[in-house]
Amino acid sequence: MKPSEIREMSIEEIDAKIRELRLQLAKERGLLTMGTSLENPMVIRNLRRDIARLLTIKKEKLREREKGKVKK
């Protein structure tokens, strides 16, 4: 997921995407724990990075919102 795509999303959409990716990450980790070999081991790393990217941009948006409230 590209940062430009995330920046176009609203905070609510970002929250929904974070929940979705965390659920998917839990499933992948569960498969790994059970001893199942993953089709693509990079999936877990990519999910973690996407979640971090979403959280970072969400925090940026919240700071911008707070900054706007303070100036008014």
Curated annotation (Swiss-Prot):
Q: Which family does the record claim for this protein?
A: Belongs to the universal ribosomal protein uL29 family.
Describe its partners and assembly state.
Part of the 50S ribosomal subunit.
Query: One Pfam annotation, family name?
Result: Ribosomal_L29
GO terms for biological process, alphabetical: translation
Which keywords appear in this protein's UniProt record, sorted alphabetically? Answer: Ribonucleoprotein, Ribosomal protein
Q: Which domain of life is it from?
A: Archaea
Q: What is this protein called?
A: Large ribosomal subunit protein uL29
PROSITE patterns from the UniProt entry? RIBOSOMAL_L29 (PS00579)
Q: Which SUPFAM superfamilies match?
A: Ribosomal protein L29 (L29p)
Q: Name one GO molecular function term.
A: structural constituent of ribosome
Provide the Gene Ontology terms for cellular component.
ribonucleoprotein complex; ribosome
Gene, per the UniProt record: rpl29
